[in-house]
Swiss-Prot record:
GO terms for cellular component: cytoplasm; ribonucleoprotein complex; ribosome. InterPro entries: bL21-like (IPR028909), bL21-like_sf (IPR036164), Ribosomal_bL21 (IPR001787), Ribosomal_bL21_CS (IPR018258). Keywords: Ribonucleoprotein, Ribosomal protein, RNA-binding, rRNA-binding. This is Large ribosomal subunit protein bL21. Disulfide bonds: none annotated. GO terms for biological process: translation. The keyword RNA-binding applies. One of its GO terms (molecular function) is rRNA binding. This protein binds to 23S rRNA in the presence of protein L20. Part of the 50S ribosomal subunit. Contacts protein L20. It holds the Pfam family Ribosomal_L21p. Belongs to the bacterial ribosomal protein bL21 family.
């Protein structure tokens, strides 16, 4: 059984017991979160596709950790001008473990 849900402007395909990195959620470690915007649920041959969401379906998860991702370097280089600009960025994330899928 797996489901596709939306969080932070992105879609995630998850199954029970899976650990997923999402965009930062303002929740404490150990908290439980429910995602109601489930786009699709598949249970064997039974496929439920939402228009746009599956009615009554939800994905339940537990917050494992908060953190920051790997550094991404942004470089702007101006040729022949002896000029360059560097910038770094580390995106905040929330790591959750999927504890249940209800359809």
């Amino acid at each position: 059984m797996y489901a596709v849900f939306q969080s932070g402007g992105k879609q995630h395909r998850v199954s029970e017991g899976q650990v997923v990195r999402l965009e930062k959620l303002e929740l404490a470690t150990g908290a439980t979160v429910e995602f109601d915007s489930v786009l699709m649920v598949v249970n064997g041959e039974d496929v439920k596709i939402g228009a746009p969401v599956v009615a009554g379906a939800k994905v339940v998860a537990e917050v494992i950790a908060q953190g920051r991702g790997e550094k991404v370097k942004i470089v702007k280089f101006r040729r022949r001008k002896h000029s360059r600009k560097q910038q770094g960025h580390r995106q905040w994330f929330t790591e959750v473990k999927i504890t249940g899928i209800q359809a």
